[in-house]
Regions:
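Single conserved hydrophobic/aromatic residue that forms the stacking wall/gate
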Residues: 1-7
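Long, hydrophobic alpha-helical segments
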Residues: 7-18
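Alpha-helical transmembrane segments of multi-pass membrane proteins
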Residues: 38, 43-60, 64, 68, ...
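Membrane-interfacial helix-loop-helix connectors in multipass membrane proteins
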Residues: 69-97, 176-178
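A structural motif at transmembrane helix-loop-helix junctions in multipass membrane proteins
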Residues: 98-134
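Junction motif at the cytosolic side of a transmembrane helix
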Residues: 118-120, 191-231
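Transmembrane helix segments
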Residues: 126-157
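Membrane-interfacial helix-loop-helix junctions in multi-pass membrane proteins
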Residues: 145-160, 164-192, 231
Length: 231
């Protein structure tokens, strides 16, 4: 169950992240963005795209979960109670999974959206955002490998880093003994990081959407933002 939960978040991060990045790039390639930025604030546009993708992810997950539970309840006798353990998952594990899973999707979707603004063609998205997918994949496998040492120092460090806390803290709560304050601190760090990444991402979105041609490197985009800030 734990590995499936981690895998579900992993798939949603990539699927909806790429979806948002593709949407941003398509608007840029067909010049729709030029009309949008004249009628709405770029921060609202950017945050709206990311939140829409996240809400779509939540709706899909909710419908799927209701369908699974409903189907199992309807045919529970046929299963012979084989999956009753799924209905007995502790509330703290479910809440941690929901909050940190949502945070993880938001965190990386903001990053994907920013990277989508750095390219002008949809075929360049994988090249530009490939590093994000690599980070998500590395975090996923490291977390799986560390399940055998759930209370080790590596897992504790991962549970506080925003790039990995969504999976590491959930795993620690599900398999180990974690103090409430640890979960709260980790979640506060994740929320603060989401806000920070969202603000930086919206600035990159504003700058990148009106620049056409070759893909813009993320380092170049950050340098441009620093120059604009210092003016």
């Amino acid at each position: 169950c734990l590995s499936r939960g981690l895998g579900d978040v992993y798939k949603r991060q990539i699927f909806y992240g790429v979806m948002v990045a593709t949407s941003v790039t398509q608007e840029k390639s067909n010049r729709t963005i030029e009309v949008l930025v004249t009628s709405a604030d770029t921060k609202i546009l950017f945050f709206g795209k990311v939140l829409a993708g996240t809400i779509a992810s939540l709706c899909q997950a909710g419908i799927l979960m209701l369908a699974i539970v409903g189907a199992y309840k309807f045919n529970q006798s046929a299963w012979g109670g084989m999956l009753d353990m799924l209905l007995d998952i502790p509330a703290n594990v479910l809440v941690t999974y929901a909050l940190f899973g949502l945070g993880g999707v938001l965190f990386y979707t903001f990053i994907y959206g920013a990277f989508g603004a750095l390219v002008s063609k949809t075929e360049d998205i994988n090249k530009s955002a490939g590093s994000i997918q690599m980070v998500i994949m590395i975090v996923y496998f490291i977390t799986l490998f560390q399940l055998m040492n759930i209370d080790g120092i590596a897992m504790k460090v991962l549970s506080y880093l925003p790039i990995s806390s969504y999976s590491a803290m959930f795993a620690r709560v599900a398999m180990g003994n974690v103090a409430v304050w640890e979960v709260v601190v980790s979640f506060i760090i994740l929320v603060a990081s989401i806000i920070g990444v969202g603000m930086i991402g919206s600035s990159i979105y504003r700058m990148g959407t009106l620049r056409y041609g070759n893909p813009i490197k993320i380092a170049t985009a950050i340098k441009s933002l620093r120059k604009q800030k210092n003016k």
